[in-house]
Amino acid sequence: VGSEMCIRDRYDMSLTDNSTIDSRSGMNPKEQLDAIFAAVAPLYKERDKTYSEIKKLLNPYGVCGLSIKELEQQEKKYVKKYFKDQILPILSPQIVDANHPFPHLLNKELYVIASLKQNGTSMIGIVPVPQFVSDILYLPGHDIRYIRMEKVIMEYLDVVFDKYEVSSKNYICVTRNADVSPDDEALEINDDFRLLMQETLHKRRRMAVVRMETAEPLDKELEKYFCDKFKITPAQIYRTKMPMKLDYIFSIMDKVPASLKRSLIDEPFTPQPSRYLTDGKVIPQVKKKDILLSYPYESMDPFLRMIKEAAYDPTVLTIRITIYRLAKKARLVEYLCAAAENGKEVTVLIELRARFDEQNNIDWSERLEEAGCRVIYGFEGYKVHSKICLITYRNRNNIEYITPVSYTHLRAHE
């Protein structure tokens, strides 16, 4: 291994021991994956159908996602001018041929591809859809009419590859394995688990492709080409009619008038305050009787208030807590840091391996350590999902505890 860190790519079929049979399914790993791929295919059809129905339902309200063919003549001129002025100058097209290797495709990013010919030679053109431009182009007018950027780029590929003959066009997206796990040997030689996880996250970008999505069917030659490049099977290539990235929906929601939004969207659920607690201090109420809160039906605010009270309570000695996921803005971390800065002994077990929240948890762990908290990064062989907290305080000559378990508030005494 040396200074390099090994990552177990659990998807890589070449590393899979197919002699191992799972006791529940009775299948080896390859058989399980094949069954998963087969089960996913009909789900795509159901998803496409649902998306199409929702699109049609929104059209009468003036919310219309369109293709180039559906645009009016003036709108087509607007889109073409916008493409030439604003999009074409920032595109980074690539040619894949004998002299130019196939590029690394980023996880869940969109790429417009073209089958090209020049002087009788076939090649592939690839255009990454820029991440720093809007996912959709809004059309002039009062209604919310828009076209997705990948469709705009695909429409004008003949302008991008103007020295080539474009014989087919498509856009694709690959999903890479996200199951990153530090190698056992790397854990043994590296005592900084946080740094190890940061290095591990960088490896995620180059993990094996587990799925490829396409907007249009691939011909057999192109399908074989991508299967060879990504080391996947045809069963892992899925054609979909709905967008491969849905982030743009939040932009559309911001444009919908509030009056219309109320008729189209369910009212957000609001957790209810507990009938067993008053607006006064939480800790004295918990000392009198056990209180059970059920989240998300009841508000988490009493738990946060209790941690804040403990941070400033002179009788509190220690706060111990496990954390699996945190929001980008977390009051809980603020209160734990305040407790440490006020001289409490604060121990936080934060799980750095929370899928897709690893970097967020790493950032928060640094903030906690800076404030003086003792931070533990989980245990080898285990992933900590439990949410428990133990507050220790001195009551005259006794040591007592308040113990929210799964952040439902209980009380215990010693």
Task: Annotate each PLM feature.
Residues 3-243, 264, 288-289, 295-298:
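Extended, highly charged clamp/arch subdomains and adjacent linkers
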Residues 87-90, 103-105, 312-371:
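Primarily the HKD phosphodiesterase
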Residues 234-317, 397-402, 406-411:
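Active-site cores of enzymes that catalyze phosphoryl transfer or operate on phosphate-rich substrates
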Residues 225, 305-306, 331-336:
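A short acidic, amphipathic alpha-helical/loop segment
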Residues 87, 174, 319, 388, ...:
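A residue-level signal for conserved active-site and pocket-lining positions in enzyme catalytic cores
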Residues 352, 356-410:
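Phosphate/diphosphate-binding loops
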Residues 72-75, 134-135, 181-182, 218-222, ...:
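Flexible loop/turn segments at secondary-structure boundaries
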Residues 2-9, 408-414:
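Conserved small/polar residues in nucleotide/adenosyl-binding loops
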